[in-house]
Design a protein with these regions (language model features):
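ABC ATPase nucleotide-binding domains
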Residues: 271-293
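A short, proline-enriched helix->beta-strand linker immediately N-terminal to the Walker B motif
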Residues: 197-201
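Catalytic Walker B motif of ABC-type/P-loop ATPase nucleotide-binding domains
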Residues: 203-207
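Helix-to-loop junction immediately C-terminal to a conserved catalytic motif
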Residues: 87
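Conserved ABC ATPase "signature" region
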Residues: 139, 154-174
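Conserved ABC ATPase signature
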Residues: 151-153, 178-182
């Protein structure tokens, strides 16, 4: 990969499309029995505006289903807007050569899309829905609602899936707790369980360690490593320590543009990170996690 740059077109690693490179890596790791990965995301020349301001410029990005990717950059660089463009919470400016395909489709019904993508925002919902039980918060994921309203028809299978998702997040003990009485770390686990009720192929996480203390961050990261065994993870973060050992690809963003895209080991260097964040960075790696100061 080349140096960080401002063209909006990150240099691509050799060897075909991103999906082909992921398949090559899987085979090199000895995985020849699994079916081929499906394309999850394809973006070409995507611009997004907020009012009169362009907040994403010329985004070009491909991600395969099941791939683990971290989008890294300073606050305000456009990472969260990129996630919203993927999940159809905001829409690109239509222009020549613009393309945004999710599983090969331009348009999705949001309820249908949520069956394929689990989405967890950086916001914690405790203040908005304090009198929602943990189990009901997870079941509400089937309806894309903020809480479990009385008029919603809940099936036994939905309850079973919700219990399964809580167990997956090691949060079964929170099923009968009010969301408003949970800690930030507990709430985040419940919200990720909510995103997992459909058993999605991809999980999108926006700043997963936001508002969590050190112990809660560490616990959550280890739980997410288990999730990564059965679902792809697309993570937005400005914290190096959030990047799980299972994540092999990093996309760097600055000022609304992708400035680098490649293998984690190639991009996570002191020079590149210093350029990205605009401060001198000292870097260490321990047990597959990277740390900076």
């Amino acid at each position: 990969m080349g140096t960080l740059h401002k063209s909006g077109l990150a240099e691509q690693a050799p060897g075909g499309t991103q999906q082909e490179r992921v398949e090559t890596r899987r085979k090199a790791d000895g995985d020849t029995a699994s079916p081929p990965l499906q394309p999850f995301l394809r973006m070409r020349n995507v611009d997004v505006a907020r009012g009169e301001k362009i907040v994403l410029r010329r985004v070009n990005l491909e991600i395969a289903e099941g791939e683990h990717v971290a989008i890294l950059g300073p606050n305000g660089c456009g990472k969260s807007t990129l996630i919203k463009a993927i999940t159809s919470e905001c829409y690109p400016i239509v222009g020549p050569g613009m393309e945004r395909l999710i599983y090969g489709r331009e348009r999705w019904d949001l309820m249908e899309l949520r069956k394929h993508l689990g989405v967890v925002s950086a916001e914690l919902p405790g203040e908005r829905t304090p009198r929602t039980l943990g189990i009901d918060a997870v079941v509400s994921g089937f309806f894309s609602s903020s809480t479990l309203w009385p008029n919603l028809e809940v099936t036994a299978q939905m309850r079973e899936r919700a219990e399964e998702a809580l167990a997956r997040m090691q949060a079964s003990h929170l099923r009968g707790r009010w969301v408003g009485e949970m800690s930030a770390g507990e709430t985040r686990r419940v919200m990720i369980a909510r995103a997992l009720v459909h058993r999605p192929a991809m999980l999108l996480l926006d700043e997963p360690s936001n508002a969590l203390d050190l112990a809660a961050q560490r616990e959550l990261r280890e739980i997410l490593r288990g999730v990564a065994r059965t679902a792809g993870i697309l993570m937005v973060t400005h914290q190096l320590a959030d990047i799980l050992p299972e994540i092999h690809r990093v996309v760097m963003m600055r000022d609304g543009e992708i400035v680098a895209d490649g293998a984690k080991g190639e991009l996570l260097t002191e020079r590149r990170l210093s350029e990205l964040f605009g401060v001198e960075v000292t870097l260490t790696e321990r047990n597959g996690y990277w740390h900076s100061w």
